[in-house]
Swiss-Prot record:
The name this protein goes by in its record: Alpha-1B adrenergic receptor
Main location, first listed in the record: nucleus
Example of a GO MF term: protein heterodimerization activity
Topological domains, Extracellular: 1-45, 105-114, 184-200, 319-325
One Pfam family this sequence matches: 7tm_1
Entry keyword Glycoprotein: yes
Lipidation (S-palmitoyl cysteine): 364
Protein's organism: Mus musculus
Length: 514
């Protein structure tokens, strides 16, 4: 959607070019003896610099938003799918529309012909419509998240989110394709003129479908979010929220920073503690409400940026006396474009998760690739393993500071101690185990397998052997030997063959935090 910036332009050269000095033209087929380039005044140079920086920032910022979700599994939620869709729409606008809008603004005329002008205007409407419809979907998603915080994972699934996003783009295409099918005013005689479609009925149709109807849905949803949030917060803090009577089994997946926990909450049984259930509800609700606040800021900025344009466009198309001056229309038009670079600023300022994701990406530390690189670099370095107490699985417990020393020291003549770990009920029985030490092996080579000795005090089981055993490579299993002074005095069942330890485990180990 671009304004008709120069409707009176009928010459073959731009009116804003400076005078050609020292130009001695001797004939139509002869060149000047001392030709010079058009002068570029300071104001126009500043405009080029500002518009170029604005477009570059919009492109880089929206790419960061997309990569943040793609490189962080805990950010791959249905809500963030809508955010990614919004970023894709803004990125498409920044790539395919803003450069040509800036060219039109700087040169003062269109240089790519009539057909491409129509395509460019349609893509403009498509991207802007997809942006606000994505915000409309986000507002509905936030209402469901706040109103039904516990049932949200089952109500809003990945499949439903993808279907909603497809619907957004289909509806946006329907609204934007009208001018390409002939629903527009007659084209001007000069192909160097290019602007928005000001056919009155299409201007009204596109304004309603692209802005006003989605805006009404957004306002209604966020009003309901505010009412529900206020009432639910009051009830939860007072501790009078009733337990759900119809739920038989509920699975909660709680994501807090980098901490992931799966818990199972069974039916109302004897000994059920209402306070713990209320605490879980309060945690879930607080998280959903915080997300609603962040996205509310995004919606508010979108309305502030695009509302002036969608007021000026239909009024100017329906009533010629109300058409704003060209200078005013340019301002409100570029104000709408300015919204494309605001969202990448809002997300890291309002969400610590997005801020950390941005910092990792800017530091070239996309999570998946970073783990693989650290695995290769560390080789046989000692890592901390902590058995996880939920569901009988093992989980990493190494802190970020301890995961990798700045010196990159590995097990070469040094001794590293693993902190005490809470054993998994499914494997280690009850009780807390003392610290387990990994002894230094001077001949330990990179790539050697790393494991833990059998935890002391483990209850015997008839159906399984030892959890961790070591054996010589290429030889049958044999009982281990007691540690001696050469290995730091640790009690292990380890022997070395050709500088590498053998390893056998009857239980899978979760890798450390790479």
């Amino acid at each position: 959607m671009n304004p008709d910036l120069d409707t009176g332009h009928n010459t073959s050269a731009p009116a804003h070019w400076g005078e050609l000095k020292d130009a001695n033209f001797t004939g139509p087929n002869q060149t000047s003896s001392n030709s010079t380039l058009p002068q570029l005044d300071v104001t126009r140079a500043i405009s080029v610099g500002c518009l170029g920086a604005f477009i570059l920032f919009a492109i880089v910022g929206n790419i960061l938003v997309i990569l943040s979700v793609a490189c962080n599994r805990h950010l791959r939620t249905p809500t963030n799918y809508f955010i990614v869709n919004l970023a894709i729409a803004d990125l498409l606008l920044s790539f395919t529309d803003l450069p040509f809008s800036a060219t039109l603004e700087v040169l003062g005329y269109w240089v790519l012909g009539r057909i491409f002008c129509d395509i460019w205007a349609a893509v403009d409407v498509l991207c802007c419509t997809a942006s606000i419809l994505s915000l409309c979907a986000i507002s509905i998603d936030r209402y469901i998240g706040v109103r039904y915080s516990l049932q949200y994972p089952t109500l809003v699934t990945r499949r439903k989110a993808i279907l909603a996003l497809l619907s957004v783009w289909v509806l946006s295409t329907v609204i934007s394709i009208g001018p390409l099918l002939g629903w527009k005013e007659p084209a001007p005689n000069d192909d160097k003129e290019c602007g928005v479609t000001e056919e009155p009925f299409y201007a009204l149709f596109s304004s309603l479908g692209s802005f006003y109807i989605p805006l009404a849905v957004i306002l209604v949803m966020y009003c309901r979010v505010y009412i529900v949030a206020k009432r639910t917060t009051k009830n939860l803090e007072a501790g009078v929220m009733k337990e759900m009577s119809n739920s038989k089994e509920l699975t909660l997946r709680i994501h807090s920073k980098n901490f992931h926990e799966d818990t199972l909450s069974s039916t109302k049984a004897k000994g059920h503690n209402p306070r713990s259930s209320i605490a879980v509800k309060l945690f879930k609700f607080s998280r959903e409400k915080k997300a609603a606040k962040t996205l509310g800021i995004v919606v508010g900025m979108f309305i502030l940026c695009w509302l002036p344009f969608f007021i000026a466009l239909p009024l100017g198309s329906l009533f010629s006396t109300l058409k704003p001056p060209d200078a005013v229309f340019k301002v409100v038009f570029w104000l709408g474009y300015f919204n494309s670079c605001l969202n990448p600023i809002i997300y890291p300022c309002s969400s610590k998760e997005f801020k950390r994701a941005f910092m990792r990406i800017l530091g070239c530390q996309c999570r998946g690739g970073r783990r693989r690189r650290r695995r290769r670099r560390l080789g046989a370095c000692a890592y901390t393993y902590r058995p996880w107490t939920r569901g009988g699985s093992l989980e990493r417990s190494q802190s970020r500071k301890d995961s990798l020393d700045d010196s990159g020291s590995c097990m070469s003549g040094s001794q590293r101690t693993l902190p005490s770990a809470s054993p998994s009920p499914g494997y280690l029985g009850r009780g807390t185990q003392p610290p387990v030490e990994l002894c230094a092996f001077p001949e330990w080579k990179p790539g050697a397998l790393l494991s833990l000795p059998e935890p002391p005090g483990r209850r015997g089981r008839l159906d399984s052997g030892p959890l961790f055993t070591f054996k010589l490579l290429g030889e049958p299993e044999s009982p281990g030997t007691e540690g001696d002074a050469s290995n730091g005095g640790c009690d292990t069942t380890t022997d070395l063959a050709n500088g590498q330890p053998g390893f056998k485990s009857n239980m899978p180990l979760a890798p450390g935090h790479f």
